[in-house]
Amino acid sequence: MTNIRKTHPIMKIINDSFIDLPTPSNISSWWNFGSLLGICLVIQIITGLFLAMHYTPDTMTAFSSVTHICRDVNYGWLIRYLHANGASMFFICLFLHVGRGLYYGSYMFTETWNIGVLLLFATMATAFMGYVLPWGQMSFWGATVITNLLSAIPYIGTDLVEWIWGGFSVDKATLTRFFAFHFILPFIIAAMAGVHLLFLHETGSNNPSGLLSDADKIPFHPYYTIKDTLGALALITVLSLLVLFSPDLLGDPDNYTPANPLNTPPHIKPEWYFLFAYAILRSIPNKLGGVLALVMSILVLALMPFLHTSKQRSMMFRPISQCLFWLLVADLLVLTWIGGQPVEHPFIIIGQVASILYFLLILVLMPLASIMENNLLKW
C-alpha cells in the first residue's frame, strides 16, 4: 500500500514541500532563515490574534487598552512583548534572508525574488501600521510624518493623504483603518509566502557555490528538518531572552506617553528596522526626492537580477565583490545609526555620504567589480 503522505491531495503538497523535497546537500545555515521567517509569522499571527481580543481601536481607549492588556489580562504582558519583539526578530531574519540572497546570487530566480521583494514591502507596511496602534506619542507622530510623505506626490498628494487619514489629521478613522489593515495583511503575507515557496520549488534551491546541484540532492527530511529545528530553538531562545529580560530594549520610551497632537516629541523616529530607510529619506533636502529615495532603497532589490554582470552566480569565489558586499552591510549599519540621530552636524553629512554610497555600491560598483572579476579569470 502506498504511503498516505504520497497519495492524499493535501498531504502530498506538504510531503513535496517539507519531506521528500530534493535539497542541495551543501546548503549552509544561511538557508535556515526561510523557515525561521515562517515561524516568526506564525508567532505574530497567534500573539496578534490574542492581543486583538483585548484591544480597542479608538483614540480615547487604545492606549488604555494596551495598558489593560499588560496589567490585567493573564500573561497579557507576555503576549504583548512577544508580539512587539517578535516583529524585531522577524526583521532580523528578513534582513539576513535578503543578505543571503544577495551574497549567493539567489536573485537569479527572478519570480521567487520579486515575490520576496513584495513580501518585504508588505511586512514593512504591516509593521508600520502595527506601531501606530498603541497610540503613544511616537505612534501618533510617526503616523503623521510618514503618511504626510505622500503629499509630495504631485497633483493628487494632498487629497491622497486626507483620503488615507479619513479626515484632516491622523485621528479615530486613521486608527480604525490601520487596525483593520494590520489585522488582514499578515494573512495576505502568509498567502504570498506560499506563492514564494511555489516559485522556489519550481526551480529548486540555490546553494553556496552557485553551481547546479541536480546531481547531488538529498531529501529535506530528516537532514534539514533537524537543522531547521536547531535554528528555530536558537530563534526562540533569543526571543525569550529579549522578552523576559529587556522587553523595552528595542522600543522607544516616548511611546509610553499617550498621543498628544499638541506636543511634538523632540526626535521623531521609527522602529530600529526602518532607521536605514529613514536616514536615506532625511538625507535628501527635497520632499519628493526623499520619498523617491526611500522607495528606491527597497525597490532597488528588484533590479538585482538585471545588475548581475558576473559569469559566476555566487560571491563565494569573488573576493572583490565580497569586499563590496560587506562594505554595503557596514554602510547599512551606519545608515541605521544615523536614522536614530538628530538632524544636526555631523550626522547630516554622514547620512548623505552613506546614502550616496548605498546606491553607488548596488548600482555601479558591484556590477563593475563583477566585470573586473570576469576579466581577471581570462588569464
Curated annotation (Swiss-Prot):
- What's a GO biological-process term for it? mitochondrial electron transport, ubiquinol to cytochrome c
Bilayer-crossing regions? 33-53, 77-98, 113-133, 178-198, 226-246, 288-308, 320-340, 347-367
Which positions are annotated as binding a ubiquinone? 201
Gene3D superfamilies per the UniProt record, alphabetical? Cytochrome Bc1 Complex, Chain C
Regarding the membrane, this protein is recorded as: Multi-pass membrane protein
- Superkingdom, according to UniProt? Eukaryota
The record's keywords, sorted A to Z, are: Electron transport, Heme, Iron, Membrane, Metal-binding, Mitochondrion, Mitochondrion inner membrane, Respiratory chain, Transmembrane, Transmembrane helix, Transport, Ubiquinone
> Per the record, GO CC terms?
mitochondrial inner membrane; respiratory chain complex III
A single GO molecular function term of this UniProt record:
ubiquinol-cytochrome-c reductase activity
Q: Does the keyword Iron apply?
A: yes
Further details from the record: Heme 1 (or BL or b562) is low-potential and absorbs at about 562 nm, and heme 2 (or BH or b566) is high-potential and absorbs at about 566 nm.
Annotated family: Belongs to the cytochrome b family.
Name of the protein in its database record: Cytochrome b
Q: Which organism is it from?
A: Desmana moschata (Russian desman)
Q: Which gene encodes it?
A: MT-CYB
